[in-house]
Amino acid sequence: MPGEGPSETENGGTADPLQHAAIAGPLASGTTPSLTLARSVVCEPDAIMIMPPFDLFVAQLSSDSTEARVDAMKKLAIVGEAMGLEGTLSKLIPFLTENITNNDKDDDDDEILLNLAGQLAVMVPGLVPGRAALPLLPILERLCSIEETVVRDKAVETMNKIVPLLFPWGNSDDGAPFGTLLATAKRLAGTDWFTAKVSAAGILPAIYAFWYAHATKGESDNESRRELRILFKDLSEDDTPMVRRSAAKHLGRFVEAVAGLTDSAEALVRGGKPQPVIADEDKRLVTYELVPIFQALSSDEQDSVRLLAVCCAGSVGCGLAREPSVTAEVVLPVVRGGCADLSW
């Protein structure tokens, strides 16, 4: 008999019984199993149709076929939605942690890891809101250390999306996120391998901005922010050019975070917005801690580092409250030097 809708299939003939069959149970939402899924899971077709979402995900991810594993990872957020928040936190995330975070070998296909990093961003904040997303950070930390650049970049991008959402209502009644974020930054910045350090420079601005927005400004919080600034300074002085290049690339955002700017320098200048009032202490930190980093990176021996540092001039100027005299003294010499640089 012909099916009455796209979720049913013909039982006779030689047609693939899975090609148009909808998954029953928690995934019965019109989603049809792909041929990749049908060929990758070794079990009877009827068993696939009633298999719980998590078991189906694990089975496909355990396939010998790279195509099947990539296909499974692309559906991670869908699996999470089918499992719900409780199932995601109790089963799905621990499974990913065990297989990704605790895996010391980079033997997973880069495309699988790239899709994992992207799917984690999709899961927040809809499925895993606020501090419930904290268990995702160790997974992303591991991905931030992967050798493949596109995987690291996607992990940093996802981390930067998740960090501001850890307190969606500005509620900071416990210190768990602060301790976790600081420890994550320290581990990435303190490793011997440059890949993690490159990622550390990319997430420090978001972590500092989170601290600035939600911490109590007490003595311990001031010390933690000082540690974050020291981490960034150390990265800017690293022996490896790739690390210094990453520090130069993200210096502008770090300056904006330290100055407490809620808008980027580009948004302020191009949007014609008035300069926000910057607290004297924040301006002092920019002047005496970050301006020297800006000046050092803009005169780095590597031309790629110098170029990225000069591009941060607008952020530095906004971090100094766009005061004409300070801009003329601090920012313009760097811009003039960049204009006269013979490397470009």
Predicted regions and their residues:
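Extended, low-complexity, acidic/polar intrinsically disordered regions
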Residues: 1-344
